[in-house]
């Protein structure tokens, strides 16, 4: 063997070791680059939980217009109820009990072919289950459509036929109407229950009766004291199904007359009437669009029927009927 063969052997042994090391390093690098991205990034702690997305908060301030337009039968009536409202959120809380809380002030206008009512209304909802509304209305009767007709006391017949026969005695006048309306409400899943008590005081200039004078009011459908109190209640049991609302309403009215009115003697064989009434029946509402905001927000049609369980003039098969249409318009809304 040539003399230079021995030095070539170690060279042949050492020279391939470097390429093998480089190849091994390259292979490890390739394996590292080919690993999944999740394996390259630190994992979050096992105990960490992602919070659910929070519901968008209610507007902190809101200005809106709302209107309800109704037509009634038994008794007959037509009325447009309108309010311009400034509303302020009370609590910025995710709590179900505190989230939908607010205070508001509004200018209210009610229009009818027989009258208008104008005045301020304040409303506060400190809890989702409690609402309180109070207001004042200046009332102007036009003397049209048989309104108003007044009586010397609370014990006069006032059914539709009699009032129609005495339409010529109707006259225009004005007065004042104060009211406080506490309401309790609750909702479990799709079932809601609410009850509203109206405490009203009337002071109307009448031609008859002095302090015992009364007048017929078609909204309350009873003889209202010219200077005195009326209590009313609406209780609704509702099923809320998206755009549909189905349920039942119980309504009652209790006029409160001056104590000396009991001095009036009834006709022979008749008892002194209380002019209270009670009715119950179905309620159906459909909202064409339930999304808030916009020029015409939540346009809704409403139908109510009520059979009289108690009434001086209307305990028969013909129910009270009401059809209505409501919507609101957001004018200003800010967080």
Model-derived features with residue positions:
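Compact, well-ordered interaction domains used in eukaryotic information-processing assemblies
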Residues: 115, 121-127
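Transmembrane beta-strand segments that form the barrel wall of outer-membrane beta-barrel proteins
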Residues: 61-72, 100-113, 120, 132-135, ...
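Cleavable N-terminal export/targeting peptides
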Residues: 1-60, 292-295, 314, 328-335
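Terminal non-domain segments
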Residues: 26-27, 38, 228-230, 237-239, ...
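Short linear interaction motifs
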Residues: 98-105, 113-115, 177, 218, ...
């Amino acid at each position: 063997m040539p003399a230079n063969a021995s030095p070539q052997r170690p060279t042949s042994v050492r020279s391939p070791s470097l390429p093998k090391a480089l190849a091994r390093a390259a292979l490890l690098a390739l394996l590292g680059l080919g690993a999944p991205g999740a394996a390259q990034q630190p994992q979050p702690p096992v105990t960490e939980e992602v919070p659910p997305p929070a519901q968008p908060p209610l507007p902190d301030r809101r200005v809106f217009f709302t209107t309800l337009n109704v037509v009634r039968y038994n008794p007959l009536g037509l009325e447009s109820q309108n309010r311009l409202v400034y509303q302020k959120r009370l609590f910025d809380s995710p709590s179900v009990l505190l989230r939908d809380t607010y205070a508001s002030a509004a200018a209210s206008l009610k229009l009818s072919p027989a009258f208008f009512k104008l005045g301020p209304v304040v409303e506060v909802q400190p809890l989702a289950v409690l609402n309180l509304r109070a207001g004042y209305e200046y009332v102007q009767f036009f003397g049209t459509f048989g309104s108003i007709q007044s009586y010397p006391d609370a014990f006069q017949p006032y059914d539709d036929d009699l009032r129609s026969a005495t339409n010529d005695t109707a006259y225009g006048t004005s007065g004042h109407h104060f009211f406080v309306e506490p309401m309790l409400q609750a909702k479990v899943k799709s079932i809601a229950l609410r009850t509203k008590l109206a405490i009203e005081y009337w002071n109307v200039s009448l031609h008859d009766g002095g302090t015992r004078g009364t007048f017929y009011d078609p909204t309350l459908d009873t003889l209202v004291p010219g200077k005195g109190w009326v209590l009313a209640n609406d209780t609704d049991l509702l099923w809320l199904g998206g755009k549909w609302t189905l349920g039942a309403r119980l309504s009652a009215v209790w006029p409160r007359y001056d104590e000396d009115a009991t001095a009036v003697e009834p006709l022979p064989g008749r008892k002194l009437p209380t002019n209270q009434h009670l009715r119950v029946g179905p309620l159906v509402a459909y909202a064409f669009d339930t999304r808030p905001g916009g020029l015409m927000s939540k346009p809704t049609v409403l139908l109510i029927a009520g059979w009289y369980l108690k009434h001086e003039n209307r305990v028969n098969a013909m129910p009270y009927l009401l059809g209505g249409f409501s919507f609101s318009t957001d004018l200003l809304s800010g967080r």
